[in-house]
Amino acid sequence: QGTAASGANSDAAVDQTAGEFLYYSGRLVQAAVYYSSNGGASEDSLNVWGNDVGYLKGKIDPYEGKIASIIPQYNWSTTFTASELTTLLNNRGYGIGTVKNAYVSAYTDTGNVYSVTFTGTSGSKTVSREACRTLLNLRSQRFTIGGGGSENAYSVNDTGESVALSAASAVDSSGKSSALSGN
């Protein structure tokens, strides 16, 4: 969302950290990305973007659930009909015919979705990493897929974001912000 989602708190955080730098293994961090919520676990950059960034490793977050009630849009869901999924896949050139089934076919070690398989009347297609999130226009790779069958509708439940440095982790138990080292 970039600067469109900025507010008094984010502006204050930027001002308070002006002139500070992040280092990982003695080198300046080239890409620092942050999230406000990870849904319970972050994810390795390799499992999302396909490139290994040493300081972007997946970890279970034992604290996220404790603050979930105050995180806007922590849990949300959407529903796709088989017809809508068929259109999405055909628009991407996957050509599997009419979608008959959609399911999570692989999870990462932290419980995020690694791949989703769509089965249609003319074949199957497995979509992996970031592509499965963007295909379904989801906020993260921490989602579940349910439904299908006779109702011919698939519900998708999503929580948090996946790959980044936690903005919440930058605040200690007293509420004082602290620098992130990346190690």
Region spans (language model):
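Conserved, single-site charged/polar hotspot
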Residues: 1-183
